[in-house]
A protein has these predicted regions:
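Short, solvent-exposed micro-motifs at the edges of structured domains
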Residues: 1-144
Length: 144
């Protein structure tokens, strides 16, 4: 069983935007520049279409970095149950076989990924992906 609160994330400008005029729009993994936060991004009715209040963020004046802090928002939580059923049978004194049935995400709970956190993106504030659905695995293990 795994239970986790949501992962923190940072709102930034699209990686191609060099709003601070430093000559470095991105370091290869996201935006260097951040927007200005003008209000609370918290929503009482967050959904995959609008995880946070996108209107709480605006482009800063050209040549500035913006005032949004690092990891100021939290994504969806994560809950997962994995289960394995094993049955071992002795074939001889030196050999055994093990039948395995394994279930990952047993209850098939939808665990959402982080929302799009880049101001200027058409999907800003939306969650567009989720972690894998339930997977079942049947195996036979021979030990000698």
């Amino acid at each position: 069983v795994t239970l986790q609160s949501g992962r923190p994330f940072t709102v930034g400008l699209l990686p191609a935007i060099d709003n601070s005029n430093t000559g470095r729009a991105a370091l290869g993994f996201g935006s260097n520049d951040r927007p200005n936060q003008t209000g609370s991004p918290a929503l009482s009715d967050a959904s995959v279409e609008r995880w946070f209040d996108t209107e709480a963020f605006v482009f800063p004046a050209f040549g500035s970095f913006g005032n949004t802090g690092r990891n100021t928002l939290e994504g969806p939580g994560f809950a997962n149950v994995n289960l394995a059923l094993l049955k071992g049978v002795a074939l001889s004194d030196a050999a055994r076989v093990q039948l395995r049935l394994e279930a990952f995400n047993l209850f098939n709970r939808t665990n959402l990924d982080l929302p799009d956190a880049f101001l200027g993106s058409p999907t800003f504030g939306q969650i567009r992906s989720a972690r894998p659905a339930r997977r079942l695995q049947l195996g036979l293990k021979l030990m000698f």
